[in-house]
């Protein structure tokens, strides 16, 4: 039995990349909060970095060379997890949504309102709460207020509380009366909930916050113009052209991560050449051997301990002249030099390498193909060791950015920044170490399957649904980014295989991730058909 105890509000580094990153909303026992932008982070706590040359090149291709460092999320190391020092570390959070309500009397108020009191407890986050100080219905004590679980968001990443004063008064109003939340049913459905102003008597049912009802005849009662608010940046954009939509607190479409992810592949050259390539962001400023001891003392040269200063400087000069390490060393001499093409070097490494590869980041060997599958599968690779490097570069709301960083201009326009400053120079990242199975399918069989008339008809159905999806979101052209039946085949196989792997090997399904290599013969770097 796992007896490890977790603190309230504790997150794994991987969760900050995919589930609860900057701009996302996290539920605590008594309220919710939003992960703040990088200006609010304690930069002094960020020391360990993610070193992977291909990852940095891919980030630079998307955000520019201003990004100098990719830091790992700090992890508390104190033996006493409840010490003041350890409790002062972590990821900054602000209360969001700010509108709260009393479950006893229904009074609604913002967190800073005079009727709301904050109960703080430095050592017990589960005891932190907002109390209604002037509840007229509570018999003894001050009830704990809970978040009003309705928000407004737009496809350009803005999010805010519903303007409840506007909502109740059905437009702009000078009325400052208190608002009350009233449930008339037992289900808590929006049709059975009403918001009322006690001063002027105006009221509005909660269902009015959601448009497109009654066959599209019901108009939303929220403002038609997005206010452009980014609470994680403490900033408001002007002139947002997005259409605000009401969402529920905790909705899965309130935050989608945009991450750049690569598998570390072997590099040509010696071990030292590979280390220099991985740490080039720090080493490109080294102009003579005398500066290397300072880099050692600053902890910027992990893994270099067995090499002398002269050896390190010689490797730096080799790399600077272009004679050092390059990706794809394990038999992948044709690895792509395009830093935005993240899959091609990996595909070449797994499909064109020798039968066995041993590297500090990647170890794999080719396995025999079962007789029943030799016609369909070209290669099976058992990956005993791999390292995946990731960097969070932004996020979207309402619209998912898609799989594996292959975004079009529409999605890039909707990417929400992680910091206010356009000159911000660092990101957060993560490294995952694990194992895996690579399967390369027979290209001729995949191509023949895709060309069947029944599959072509199915492809037309998928394309029609894909175009309708993009049309509803005003994304042009409507048929852009359609993955094709090749990808659908590989994706379907991948999920079926992961499910069976979880059942047969004892892995948690959440611990298994897929990586799909799908390109048609005419695509750059194609064809690819593997998982």
Segments predicted by a language model, with ranges:
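Extended, well-ordered protein cores
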Residues: 1-168, 172, 178-185, 229-531
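Internal insertion modules embedded within essential enzymes
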Residues: 214-227
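Extended charged low-complexity segments that act as oligomerization/scaffolding linkers
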Residues: 193-196, 201-206
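Contiguous, function-dense segments enriched for cysteine-driven chemistry
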Residues: 147, 205-209
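Extended acidic/polar, glycine-enriched regions
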Residues: 211-214, 240
């Amino acid at each position: 039995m796992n007896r490890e105890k977790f603190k309230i509000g504790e997150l794994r580094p991987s969760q900050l990349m995919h589930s609860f990153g900057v701009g996302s909303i996290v539920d605590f026992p008594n309220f919710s909060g939003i992960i703040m932008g990088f200006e609010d982070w304690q930069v002094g706590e960020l020391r360990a970095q993610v070193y992977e040359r291909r990852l940095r090149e891919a980030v630079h291709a998307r955000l520019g060379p201003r990004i100098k460092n990719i830091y790992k999320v700090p992890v508390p190391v104190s033996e006493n997890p409840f010490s003041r020092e350890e409790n002062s570390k972590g990821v900054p959070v602000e209360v969001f949504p700010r509108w709260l309500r009393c479950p006893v009397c229904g009074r609604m108020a913002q967190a800073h309102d005079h009727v709301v009191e904050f109960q703080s407890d430095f050592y017990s986050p589960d005891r932190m709460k907002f109390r209604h100080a002037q509840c007229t219905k509570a018999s003894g004590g001050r009830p704990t207020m809970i978040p009003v679980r309705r928000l407004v968001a737009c496809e350009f990443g803005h999010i805010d509380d519903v303007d409840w004063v506007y909502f109740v008064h059905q437009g702009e109003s000078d009325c400052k009366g208190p608002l009350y939340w009233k449930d008339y049913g037992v289900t808590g459905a929006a049709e059975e909930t009403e918001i009322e102003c006690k001063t002027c008597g105006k009221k509005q049912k909660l269902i009015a916050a959601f448009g497109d009802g009654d066959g599209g005849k019901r108009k939303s009662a929220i403002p038609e113009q997005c206010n452009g608010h980014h609470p994680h940046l403490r900033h408001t954009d002007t002139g947002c052209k997005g259409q605000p939509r009401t969402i529920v607190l905790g909705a899965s479409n309130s935050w989608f991560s945009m991450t750049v992810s690569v598998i570390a592949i072997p590099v040509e050259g010696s071990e030292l050449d590979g280390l220099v390539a991985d740490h080039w962001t720090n080493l490109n400023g080294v102009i003579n051997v005398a500066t290397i001891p300072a880099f050692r003392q600053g902890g910027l040269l992990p893994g270099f301990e067995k090499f002398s200063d002269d050896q390190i400087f010689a490797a730096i000069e080799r790399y600077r002249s272009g004679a050092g390490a390059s990706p794809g060393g394990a038999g992948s001499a044709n690895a792509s030099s395009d830093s935005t093409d993240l899959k091609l070097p990996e595909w070449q490494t797994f499909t064109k390498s020798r039968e066995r590869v041993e590297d500090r980041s990647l170890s794999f060997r080719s396995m025999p193909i079962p007789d029943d599958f030799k016609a369909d599968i070209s290669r099976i690779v058992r990956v005993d060791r791999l390292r995946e490097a990731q960097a969070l570069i932004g996020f979207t709301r309402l619209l998912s950015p898609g799989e594996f960083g292959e975004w079009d201009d529409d999605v890039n326009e909707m990417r929400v920044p992680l910091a206010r400053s356009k000159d911000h120079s660092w990101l957060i990242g993560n490294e995952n170490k694990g194992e895996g199975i690579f399967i390369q399918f027979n290209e001729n069989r995949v191509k023949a399957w895709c060309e069947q008339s029944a599959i072509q008809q199915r492809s037309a159905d998928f394309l029609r649904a894909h175009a309708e999806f993009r049309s509803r979101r005003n994304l042009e052209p409507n048929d852009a980014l359609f993955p094709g039946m090749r990808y659908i085949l590989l994706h379907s196989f991948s999920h079926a295989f992961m499910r069976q792997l979880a059942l047969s090997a004892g892995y948690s399904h959440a611990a298994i991730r897929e990586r799909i290599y799908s390109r048609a013969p005419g695509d750059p770097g194609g064809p690819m058909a593997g998982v």
